[in-house]
Amino acid sequence: MSVKIAHAALWTADLETSADFWSRYFDATIGERYESRRRPGFASRFVELDGGPSIELMTGPWVPEDITRAGAEVPGWAHIAVSVGSHEAVDALARRLDEDGLLVSQPRMTGDGFYEAVARTLDGSLVEITS
């Protein structure tokens, strides 16, 4: 048996704004909007990055606008990490995110050997940007 991650999913209060975030900062290709006939109000779009699994952005009228629970660390996924290939690419993307008020932590070398910066999506999900 070969096991790999096919995709990860993120709830969002604003599907189009979330899709724009991934397109603008990560040059992602955004798939067509899907609207469920079985679950009225549910819609999703897939984010395709240059390599690796895709990200499914999902929304519905039941998703609260503030899904961050005031920044609390709660059970569940903590973040998604995206590799951009080099220290220079991390630095450049971190500058753009900082200018737009989305950078949480400046680029740095972590104790476990990663060069990374951390950004927050408009919904509050954390994205680690690694080299």
Give the location of each predicted region.
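Core segments of cupin and vicinal oxygen chelate
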Residues: 2, 11-54
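Short, charged/polar, Gly/Pro-enriched secondary-structure boundary elements
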Residues: 52-55, 65, 123-127
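Acetyl-CoA-dependent GNAT
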Residues: 59-64, 131
